[in-house]
Amino acid sequence: MSPQTETKASVGFKAGVKEYKLTYYTPDYETKDTDILAAFRVTPQPGVPPEKAGAAVAESSTGTWTTVWTDGFTSLDRYKGRCYHIEPVAGEENQYIAYVAYPLDLFEEGSVTNMFTSIVGNVFGFKALRALRLEDLRIPVAYVKTFQGPPHGIQVERDKLNKYGRPLLGCTIKPKLGLSAKNYGRAVYECLRGGLDFTKDDENVNSQPFMRWRDRFCFCAEALYKAQAETGEIKGHYLNATAGTCEEMIKRAVFARELGVPIVMHDYLTGGFTANTSLAHYCRDNGLLLHXHRAMHAVIDRQKNHGMPFRVLAKALRMSGGDHIHAGTVVGKLEGEREITLGFVDLLRDDFIEKDRSRGIYFTQDWVSLPGVIPVASGGIHVWHMPALTEIFGDDSVLQFGGGTLGHPWGNAPGAVANRVALEACVQARNEGRDLASEGNEIIREAS
């Protein structure tokens, strides 16, 4: 036996399965301002006490399933995560909210990738847990300040576009796949000249055989410049720079900048947080706005007892960097409860958000002037939803109508005109003190 092993044995070092509860469940722990706090919805397996399940969640901070001899080379008390509080979920059998505190030193500065790898990278497969959901995170000020955040933010975007006092209008070009680059550009032009502020590549428009990315970028740039000349307004098209490699993604963003367009787009979940943060840094350095699409989010956030809700993904996007993010509609075809949606909309836009469990916000969050993100309402909405959308999302938003623009029987430009007229009527009515909730349909009829 080596001297090191002999020493460990003499002080009680024993191999075997570790009892998580003894190490990671510390109900007397007082959280620090520098801790990252997490609220997990825990569903233990039958026979597993909630304290053990909560402690197992915290194990991802430093642990493994057994005691190892290298534990003696560091301070477990300094670095371990701690499950410091557990409470039952009202109205749900065998579900608990477990609160876990992680010391800040566990995380690399400015890395959403590392944060998620540490907190949720492994624990969701533990046998002791039937299901696990990360409900919310409290990001401490000390960690927030290590992130650049959105490339520009809400106010800078409005200044770039010279558009104030109303929501912005967008449209996703349809059909999303199958058009040639020239026909695609024609659809963009018709929408922009009709009064929209933005048009958009759909999330899976990258560089397919029928429409290579460079051709699409060129025809879309031609369309927006022509629409700008005709309308006197600044226009944009979300050119999707998402690609198979980070190098190719940046190459596409560079070409967009050379064309002089104002905004590019990234599928930040399928592309990954490392790629997204890299693109966000490029966009800030080169004056491009960044539209982030949440493709794949429902794989992660739709289940009520497993995965993580969109509020966590929204916080991560604000840290990683994006000037826009899709946020559901409340009234459209995609799932989204009003209060929960407004909860993460506030997390995207506001500088300081108070704890409010009724809206799914488990912790007070201080963003310390990190730029805000504009929420994008998109998915199954049309002109008759305009009063509700204007009331729900307010001015600092993008209201994005795909089929609600392109489906107009007279064509794309009349569809865009209808949306612009409806929006301006709703904003004027709101400013005059009219109730959009009760008078919305009447306001739209008057405008038509």
Swiss-Prot record:
Query: Which Gene Ontology biological process is one annotated for this entry?
Result: reductive pentose-phosphate cycle
Cofactor(s) needed:
Mg(2+)
Against SUPFAM superfamilies, the record matches this protein to:
RuBisCo, C-terminal domain (SSF51649), RuBisCO, large subunit, small (N-terminal) domain (SSF54966)
Q: How cofactor binds (record note)? A: Binds 1 Mg(2+) ion per subunit.
- For site (Transition state stabilizer), what residue positions does UniProt give? K333
List the active-site residues.
K174, H293
Q: Report if keyword Transcription regulation is assigned.
A: no
Q: Any idea which residues bear N-acetylproline here?
A: P3
Positions of the propeptide removed during maturation:
1-2
Q: Which reaction does it catalyse?
A: 2 (2R)-3-phosphoglycerate + 2 H(+) = D-ribulose 1,5-bisphosphate + CO2 + H2O; D-ribulose 1,5-bisphosphate + O2 = 2-phosphoglycolate + (2R)-3-phosphoglycerate + 2 H(+)
Major subcellular location class: plastid
Q: Which residues bind substrate?
A: N122, T172, K176, R294, H326, S378
Q: Which compartment or compartments is the protein found in? A: Plastid, Chloroplast
Modification after translation = The disulfide bond which can form in the large chain dimeric partners within the hexadecamer appears to be associated with oxidative stress and protein turnover.
Instruction: List the keywords (alphabetical).
Output: Acetylation, Calvin cycle, Carbon dioxide fixation, Chloroplast, Disulfide bond, Lyase, Magnesium, Metal-binding, Methylation, Monooxygenase, Oxidoreductase, Photorespiration, Photosynthesis, Plastid
Please provide, in alphabetical order, the Gene Ontology terms of the cellular component aspect for this entry. chloroplast
Q: Which PROSITE patterns match?
A: RUBISCO_LARGE
Q: What sort of enzyme, by top EC class, is this?
A: lyase
Which residues carry the post-translational modification N6,N6,N6-trimethyllysine, per the record? K14
The record makes one more remark, namely: The basic functional RuBisCO is composed of a large chain homodimer in a 'head-to-tail' conformation. In form I RuBisCO this homodimer is arranged in a barrel-like tetramer with the small subunits forming a tetrameric 'cap' on each end of the 'barrel'.
Whom does it interact with, and what assembly results? Heterohexadecamer of 8 large chains and 8 small chains; disulfide-linked. The disulfide link is formed within the large subunit homodimers.
Q: Which PANTHER family match?
A: RIBULOSE BISPHOSPHATE CARBOXYLASE (PTHR42704), RIBULOSE BISPHOSPHATE CARBOXYLASE LARGE CHAIN (PTHR42704:SF15)
Q: Which family does the similarity line name? A: Belongs to the RuBisCO large chain family. Type I subfamily.
Q: What protein name applies here? A: Ribulose bisphosphate carboxylase large chain
To which species is this protein native? Answer: Dichapetalum crassifolium
